[in-house]
């Protein structure tokens, strides 16, 4: 067998493996990254926040983890939770603007608190997406290796 023919066969096998990975990557990433990530978010934030986590096919053999968790008014809560917020002032909208005349929240000891204006101290970012990717990507790599090896064994029979 000539060297050129051997190279062609190896290239063909490599292309088939890459195509196999690309065709199955979204399923594997869903099982290894998305579902466990949603469970983590549901436990640490809320079920509604976990439902806003998704995977998107972003190219050949590529997927991106997306989180688009928004308030009823459309505010990007996912961004505030992921990266944190600076200290900021919060004012009641007032009834004439479709809101309430006072802000309401539950204090640390469970009592109801009210104010027209508060100076919020800001929040530290939780790095939810970064943490999920860091913790779950090794499992996806292992899954790709295992599935590819199984596919190659079946394909060679």
Feature locations, PLM:
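Short, Lys/Arg-rich flexible segments
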Residues: 1-74, 97, 101-157
């Amino acid at each position: 067998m000539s060297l050129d023919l051997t190279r062609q066969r190896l290239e063909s096998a490599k292309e088939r493996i890459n195509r196999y990975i690309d065709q199955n990557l979204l399923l594997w990433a869903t099982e290894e990254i998305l579902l466990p990530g949603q469970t983590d978010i549901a436990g640490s934030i809320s079920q509604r926040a976990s439902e806003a986590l998704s995977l998107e096919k972003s190219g050949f053999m590529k997927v991106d983890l997306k989180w688009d968790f928004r308030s009823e008014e459309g505010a990007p809560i996912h961004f505030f939770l992921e990266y944190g917020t600076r200290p900021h002032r919060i004012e009641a909208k007032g009834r004439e603007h479709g809101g309430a005349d006072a802000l309401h929240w539950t204090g640390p000891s469970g009592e109801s608190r009210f104010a027209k204006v508060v100076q919020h101290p800001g929040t530290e970012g939780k790095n939810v997406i970064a943490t999920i990717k860091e913790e779950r990507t090794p499992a996806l790599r292992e899954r790709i290796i295992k599935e590819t090896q199984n596919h190659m064994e079946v394909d060679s029979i």
